[in-house]
Structures are given as structure tokens and as C-alpha cells.
Amino acid sequence: MSQKYLFIDRDGTLISEPPSDFQVDRFDKLAFEPGVIPELLKLQKAGYKLVMITNQDGLGTQSFPQADFDGPHNLMMQIFTSQGVQFDEVLICPHLPADECDCRKPKVKLVERYLAEQAMDRANSYVIGDRATDIQLAENMGITGLRYDRETLNWPMIGEQLTRRDRYAHVVRNTKETQIDVQVWLDREGGSKINTGVGFFDHMLDQIATHGGFRMEINVKGDLYIDDHHTVEDTGLALGEALKIALGDKRGICRFGFVLPMDECLARCALDISGRPHLEYKAEFTYQRVGDLSTEMIEHFFRSLSYTMGVTLHLKTKGKNDHHRVESLFKAFGRTLRQAIRVEGDTLPSSKGVL
């Protein structure tokens, strides 16, 4: 899996920049920006690696002796380290603008290895800095830039923005039999819109969203003039894929879930978002159809979903009424999924380190 990085400017972003000469060359000039340490700790917990990148005009010259820089800088690094903040690398350009070097921000010389490795998650990596050159660096790297400002985009705001999860996925699946469009928002409730062409199936899918505590939009055009087989099967495949994508790296999720009774039915559902597809299913129905949905396709739907979502799923129901038996399965799955996808921490719930 590619790595999320934060490339962070030093003066004016991590520590205050003296307005008189823009040099932190004495200990009394060293002051941290408000909230920087707790927010960096939060960002590390969210899986970001930190890289400091800074222009230090004329470092090592008479106007800015190396020793004057080293004292405050080393103290700053010691304080960061003592509080648990770890920088993978500190990148410094010591040149003046007149030197026309190739390593001064916004040029990308200092960060070339991150661009070449193809191991950086560009969609979720950022440059954070207080100057236009930092934003230009981000553009040159092909990632997003965040313009730090104590009032308009301070460290608590940045921490909230980058750790807030909007777990969303959009999957389009087109075959000769079906055209399916699925969108899933795991952290939003209500407003689901579902149209598969099979009315009772729409109702069942809505039960998953309602009891799962998330929103989804599903539009399906299938070969219903034949039967509902391809429509139900392919919807399960597309929905499972969307749920898997929306879960992302699964960091902090509960992972497991359980059971739900309904009316005279007792539905049992056990779910493990394990990365290992498996379905155990036990349900018997009196009739071949409930509404316009084939009862034999219910198992097929959950098997398809568990396969593409990568989950271990156990489903069982018993009761007297087919409608209630079917509905109990979908409600139980939704309620169980609600528990399993809930975020309650920052760590991956696996001793293997991968799900």
C-alpha cells in the first residue's frame, strides 16, 4: 500500500518566523506554532509520515552561520522527538535565491526520491506551508497544498481536515446483462436512493442502508425481461466492491458484528471484515418469490457481496413468514455491518497488520 506523506515547511509553519530578519538564529527566537505538536501526533496516528522541507537563505555563510542555525534547530528537533513527533527526513536548501540552485522550493530536487519511488499516495499526501512557494511546490509534485495561517488554516484546522474521514466510493459495473452505478457514503445517514427495477429488492437494499447507518445510491438497468438473476447478482458484486473501497485502509474500525430478531423470526448474522471472502447461509422459504424477488437469489446476493467486499459472513434465519424471513436477513446484515464499520480508534484491528 502506498504511503501518505506530509511535506511541512519549518519557519512560519512549524515554528514562528521572526519578522525582523526571517532567521531563527538564536534560542530566544524559537517559538512553536500554536497546537502544532498535538496535531502532528494526531496526524501520525492517522498514518501520515512527516517530512520537513525548508529554505534557509544563505545557511553556512557569514550572514547566517551554520552554528547559529544548529543550536535552535537541534533544540526544536529534540523537543519534537521528546513528545513523540518523528520526522522521516529533514530537507534543507541552504542557498540564496540569487544562487539559482535546483533544490530551492518550489523546485522538486529535494523531494525527487518520493516522486520516483511511486510509493507515495499522491491523492492523500500534502505540502503544508505559509508561503506561495509551498503551494507551488505542491503543484509541482502533483499533490495538494495547504496554506498555513494562524487564523484561517491553523494546526487544529489542518488536523481536523486531514483526519476527518469521508468514507466514500463510487463503482460503475457494466456488462452485457447489466449496467450498475453504486455510490456509498459510510459516514452519512439518510437520503438513500435505490432503483434496481426489482421493487422488493430495492426495499431490502434500503434496509441495509437504514440499519447500517449509511447512505447509498444504486441505479441498475438489467435484463429483467429474462429474470432477476443478473440484476441481483451483479448488484451484490458492485455493492460489495463499493463497501470495500469506502472502508479504505480499515484503520480503527470495529471489524466484527452480531444478531437481530424480528417479529416471529430470529435472524442471526455474524460478520468479520477479514479480507477473506466466505459465506455460511441457512434459510428456507415456502415460496419461490417474495414480491418480485426470487428467494433463491437472496443467498446469491450475499455470496456475491461477501466475495467482492472480502468479508466472512454467517447468516441464518427461521420463522413462519417468507417476507419477514427475507427482511430479517437484510436488517440483521445492516445492523451487523453498522457495528463492524464503526470507527472507534486509529489502529488496524489485526495482529497481522493487514486486513
Curated annotation (Swiss-Prot):
Q: Which cofactor does it need?
A: Mg(2+); Zn(2+)
InterPro entries registered for this protein in UniProt: HAD-like_sf (IPR036412), HAD-SF_hydro_IIIA (IPR006549), HAD_sf (IPR023214), His_synth_bifunc_HisB (IPR020566), HisB_N (IPR005954), Histidinol-phos (IPR006543), IGPD_sf (IPR038494), ImidazoleglycerolP_deHydtase (IPR000807)
Region described as Histidinol-phosphatase:
1-166
Give the active-site positions: 9, 11
Subcellular location, record wording? Cytoplasm
Q: Which NCBIfam families match?
A: HAD-SF-IIIA, hisB_Nterm, Histidinol-ppas, PRK00951.2-1, PRK00951.2-4, PRK05446.1
Protein name per Swiss-Prot or TrEMBL = Histidine biosynthesis bifunctional protein HisB
Organism, per UniProt? Escherichia coli (strain K12)
Q: Which gene produces this protein?
A: hisB
